[in-house]
Structures are given as C-alpha cells and as structure tokens.
Amino acid sequence: MSKRGRGGSSGAKFRISLGLPVGAVINCADNTGAKNLYIISVKGIKGRLNRLPAAGVGDMVMATVKKGKPXLRKKVHPAVVIRQRKSYRRKDGVFLYFEDNAGVIVNNKGEMKGSAITGPVXKECADLWPXIASNAGSIA
C-alpha cells in the first residue's frame, strides 16, 4: 500500500455496491453520544463531473453529527460505514443487506472514538478495520 493509504485499515478492499451518496444520513452505532451522521464526503474517491461520491460498507467518510451531544455537533468527523441497506454481493455469491444504514465515528488512524457498537458489523468492514472489529458485538 502507498504511503497515503487508508488510515488504520488492513487488507484488500473488494468492490461492493455503493448505497450511500453524499448527503445521506446514517445512524451512529457507537456510544459517543451522536444519534446520526450526515455524509459530506467519501475518502479516496476521485470522481466524475456531476456524479455524487458514494460510500459502501467499510468506506471511510467525512461526516457531521445532525442529532446528538452538543460537543459533537457542528464539527466534521471521520467515520466508517459498518452497515448498509443496499444489497451487495460477497465473493461466495451470496447477496447481503442490513435493515439500516449505520456508521461509527473514528479518528484519522481508524481507531474508534467510542468503546461499543450496537448491532452487527459487516464482515467486509471488520476485515478492513481491526480496531472496529475488536469493539463489535457481532460480525455478520
């Protein structure tokens, strides 16, 4: 991996269907005090004219907190998407989707700001982000 790689992620990222464009509001699944996250950009996307950058499971995004503790609001935080409603295909051929879109707030190195995650974490995300996998209750 190059010097300017993905923060604290490890391993190769496979192509999955991107279900969360810029402007999407996702649930915050950690115990930082944030209720939801508003995606303002996606890390590592070069882009095409008039195309909205979109994120999928395991992507790092820049997000703001729309509902939650006042200390967290009106600031830009890095976050990692851990669940998405849009179905995506795994290498073994199974299609998988979750009942909500969710992310967790991290720092630039990929270490979680909170200490617990509510709900399952996608296996693709857990493989990429070991610091998130260690705090996950269940990995699906």
Swiss-Prot record:
This is Large ribosomal subunit protein uL14. SUPFAM superfamilies: Ribosomal protein L14. The keyword ATP-binding does not apply. One of its GO terms (cellular component) is cytosolic large ribosomal subunit. Coiled coil: none annotated. It comes from the Eukaryota. GO terms for molecular function: large ribosomal subunit rRNA binding; structural constituent of ribosome. GO terms for biological process: translation. It is found in: Cytoplasm. Keywords: Cytoplasm, Phosphoprotein, Ribonucleoprotein, Ribosomal protein. It comes from Canis lupus familiaris (Dog). The modification Phosphoserine is found at residue 17. The modification Phosphotyrosine is found at residue 38. Transmembrane segments: none annotated.
